[in-house]
């Protein structure tokens, strides 16, 4: 509802609003509604396979002059099938790719040389978190989870790929960034980051 209010303040109107479970793939009726309402931008929380089904339904009704914006549930390799189906496909994600960090390229080169494949999605965060966890254990001088958690809140943890990891008192990562990506040429390309706008 906050997004709707913000859009109204920008003199933009939400003309179609629907909710679906995480399995629905029958979107023919919705596609007709979107066409009738002349929707140009679709903001979605659908999974990738659902978003693809929606785009296919939009093609059936010849309503392809639209852009789709989703979250990291559509920032997948499967969504590359959406190329050319509509005017634009965008995704936001708090998981920035390793190549977007200055030390990401050497990390990727070493990883691929060692394992002959790229790391799993977000794997560099797991790699970095092991360094931070190790530092917290050393600072806590204990293996007790509560002591480690307390230590993690008090350190500026060195993370070899992303730089640092710090947390607030609720356990949320401080200074996390969200990337906005566009599907172009079969790849997700970073368009902007929240820490740089």
PLM ranges: what are they?
Residues 1-197:
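Extracytosolic ligand-binding ectodomains
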């Amino acid at each position: 509802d906050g997004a709707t209010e913000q859009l109204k303040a920008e003199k933009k109107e939400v003309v179609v609003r629907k909710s679906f479970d995480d399995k629905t793939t029958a979107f023919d009726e919705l596609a007709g509604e979107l066409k009738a309402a002349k929707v140009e931008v679709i903001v979605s929380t659908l999974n990738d396979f659902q978003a693809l089904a929606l785009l296919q339904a939009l093609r059936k009704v010849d309503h392809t002059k639209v852009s789709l914006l989703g979250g990291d549930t559509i920032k997948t390799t499967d969504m590359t099938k959406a190329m050319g189906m509509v005017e634009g496909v965008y995704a936001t994600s708090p998981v920035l790719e390793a190549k977007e960090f200055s030390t990401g390229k050497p990390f990727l080169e070493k990883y691929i040389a060692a394992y002959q494949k790229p790391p799993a999605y977000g794997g560099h965060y797991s790699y970095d978190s092991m360094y931070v966890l190790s530092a917290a254990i050393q600072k806590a001088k204990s293996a007790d989870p509560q002591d480690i958690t307390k230590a993690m809140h008090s350190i500026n943890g060195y993370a070899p790929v992303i730089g640092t990891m710090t947390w607030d008192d609720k356990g949320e990562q401080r200074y996390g960034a969200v990337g906005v990506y566009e599907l172009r040429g079969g790849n997700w390309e970073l368009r902007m980051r929240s820490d740089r706008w």
